[in-house]
Amino acid sequence: MILYPAIDLKDGECVRLKLGEMSEATVYNRDPAAQAKAFEEQGFEWLHVVDLNGAFAGASVNGAAVEAILKATRNPVQLGGGIRSLEQIEAWLERGLARVILGTVAVRDPALVREACGKFPGKIAVGIDARGGKVAVEGWAETSDLTAAELAKRFEGAGVAAIIYTDIDRDGVLTGINWEATIALADAVSIPIIASGGLASMADIERMVKPDAAKLEGAISGRALYDGRIDPKEALAMLRKARA
């Protein structure tokens, strides 16, 4: 079970949004590379990065900030937001990314996701972001008719390394992860699930290590870490103990 600290990039800065609204951005660090280094020094094993501008633009916008992060940390980094082609995937992996997250393109062009999984085994994750149970795309600006489980099942056997499941209605508001929906998704597919959206306190960390959450690969935390609601040392110790 891995706790992924999140760096969301908007205009080159480390921010957190509320319910996915770009107008509701709180700046936590104007130096994302320094934040990445701080997370590494706190003992985190991975880093979750999202190019928020890129998610809306359909192409990488905060590339310079991502490259600075890659230079600042030795931890593996997964990146999502605006990555929509094999060429973009390959370019980012060549720059040192450990994993690329495909969101909108997983809905629009699932064949590309399967091709990417074949070409870059173990390097492709699918981001499934749901609002009211339906998958949202284009930086959460549009909602499709697909449910999270329907989309996830399309990629069974494709070689997807993980599915990052975000409940948009919980994102950035510190109300706790939607464990019922997340565990239901984990039970519906064999692909490892990473929970995202709403992780609020140490109670969520304690929830992560319960037996019914055993299928989860981990969870992503943003605002709760930045606001000090989760103690990194205590959280990581709890997760390490659960893995032992």
Curated annotation (Swiss-Prot):
UniProt EC number: 5.3.1.16
GO molecular function: 1-(5-phosphoribosyl)-5-[(5-phosphoribosylamino)methylideneamino]imidazole-4-carboxamide isomerase activity
Location(s) in or outside the cell: Cytoplasm
Main enzyme class: isomerase
An annotated GO BP: L-tryptophan biosynthetic process
Pathway involvement of the protein, from the record: Amino-acid biosynthesis; L-histidine biosynthesis; L-histidine from 5-phospho-alpha-D-ribose 1-diphosphate: step 4/9
A Pfam family per the record: His_biosynth
HAMAP family found in the cross-reference section: HisA
Protein family: Belongs to the HisA/HisF family.
Name the record gives this protein: 1-(5-phosphoribosyl)-5-[(5-phosphoribosylamino)methylideneamino] imidazole-4-carboxamide isomerase
